[in-house]
């Protein structure tokens, strides 16, 4: 026997931000599965009746998604957050000038307790700027003079993300029929992983220009009489790729305990999937801010070797256990129930030498055991018409206090979390 199937996958998302509605809609064709089974009859009398050999391909995960959101900012801007990061880190004029002028500041001045990568990129592109009124010794009531680095007010923003890829699984199977009562099977699975994510965040900025004889510059903070003017903007592009391969083994049995009954019990165990993966990241911050004479661009790959932007590691998923039961009634109704459990806190993260990674502590602390319950029924109403209904409940993989701990040189801020859900 041989089979294959195609599908059309439609991705549609909608967003609302400060009164602005946005929608993304895209349809892609996909080869979801194909396979064949060769059956060898052994005997009608012996315990072993049939041996089946199979090969299958299916796309176990499809990552294709689109999302966009944007609207009016009313003065809010990420640039103020980035200037706040620098100020909170205790930046001074010397460090500001060194970061601005250094050929590669991301190694010399960066550490987790000082300046973030993204805030330094913002400094070098004018997304934040030194406050000319700053006075470290000032003790008066003008708070602006106490702030070393300033941001810009925002007018509008736009966020867009596109995800591509999937997990393709290639299965090599063998199964045995023992007396038409017990069915045993084993499957070797080989996985091909590819996930690409591109996200882009843009802000249009506002500046303030003097209407008197003061000068013609554009300032971050207005004084009385200044007028708001368009001040250009900036775009932060983030690139992320995950690729690799994996292997696992699945063992299962279906048992018919009663010879004259269609009732059956299923048991299966899946070994961990052992993955070897590579993550690659990059970020580009481009600005064209009217307060400055020229546009600027910072591309991390121009400063950092692949050693900093590429990460190789091994991941092993948890053991997975499954029990199921099903039967038919009168040849018209089929009933089934299934329970599955996997403890994701037992997942393992190692480097290519087999040593445990530092993130392993977070895996054990923030991941849960996941229980999945599925029940379903199908009723044949007419020879060519059936009704099917089902219920699926999955508990949350992440604990409530889990957070996204990005790699050092990741500047993306989007976060995905699978909560408890029913379908």
List PLM regions with ranges:
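Short secondary-structure boundary/capping segments within folded domains
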Residues: 1, 25-26, 44-45
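Transmembrane beta-strand segments of Gram-negative outer membrane beta-barrel proteins
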Residues: 1-12
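Surface-exposed strand-loop-strand hairpins of Gram-negative outer-membrane beta-barrel proteins
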Residues: 10-27, 242-244
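Outer-membrane beta-barrel porins/channels
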Residues: 32, 37-423
